[in-house]
Amino acid sequence: MNNFFQGYNLLFQHSLFASYMDWFHSFNCSLLLGVLVFVTLLFGYLIFGTFYFKSKKIEYQFGELLCSIFPTIILLMQMVPSLSLLYYYGLMNLDSNLTVKVTGHQWYWSYEYSDIPGLEFDSYMKSLDQLSLGEPRLLEVDNRCVIPCDTNIRFCITSADVIHAWALNSLSVKLDAMSGILSTFSYSFPMVGVFYGQCSEICGANHSFMPIALEVTLLDNFKSWCFGTME
């Protein structure tokens, strides 16, 4: 199904939950395409078939029954995977092994590891003269948020001033950061890598210059990074 919508679907997803969301998106696109074809054929039948059947008396009870059953079936086909995704997301929020507090500022992010005393830092976008070879422009930061893979992480998102949004498209993650409100979600990352995102809520003049860089690494490497950062 994903191959059919290649080029029109979401980005390549790097987590199990994001893959489910990608599949659900493609599944809904397939349903939408089927409904579009069916309605087009039905309109063609009503327009051109009227000339043939206008002199005959026709009972539409069976047609009315079908028009009631088909939408119900389509809604059920959407409801079952939607509830499954909602249930899976609820299971992710039941328990966590590490808590990271993310605070949005104009125009940078602050990270605080609540379970590791003293581990907190600010994350600013790197300027052009600070970039190393291979680092993406307008996306790389001076301090990445580093987390271990295969670990359930609870993120607590808030803001110190205006509304921001902590968003990582390749992970299907987007949560608003609002002052005075602590929004939480849990997530598990099955693969290592560096994932980039940006603030997705217009927050002022430099809104486009507060990127997000999330580095997922092995647990041993994460422990070494923690010790090195706190020294």
Swiss-Prot record:
Mitochondrial intermembrane face residues: 1-30, 90-231
UniProt main location, coarse: mitochondrion
Cofactor(s), by name: Cu cation
Residue runs in coiled coils: none
Membrane topology: Multi-pass membrane protein
Keywords: Copper, Electron transport, Magnesium, Membrane, Metal-binding, Mitochondrion, Mitochondrion inner membrane, Respiratory chain, Translocase, Transmembrane, Transmembrane helix, Transport
Binding site for Cu cation A2: C199, E201, C203, H207
Catalyzed reactions: 4 Fe(II)-[cytochrome c] + O2 + 8 H(+)(in) = 4 Fe(III)-[cytochrome c] + 2 H2O + 4 H(+)(out)
Segments in the Mitochondrial matrix topological domain: 53-69
Cysteine disulfide links: none
Residues annotated for Mg(2+) binding in this entry: E201
Consequence of substituting N143I: In strain: CB4857
GO molecular function per UniProt: copper ion binding; cytochrome-c oxidase activity
Family to which this protein belongs: Belongs to the cytochrome c oxidase subunit 2 family.
Protein name in the entry: Cytochrome c oxidase subunit 2
Taxonomic source organism: Caenorhabditis elegans
Taxon lineage: Eukaryota, Metazoa, Ecdysozoa, Nematoda, Chromadorea
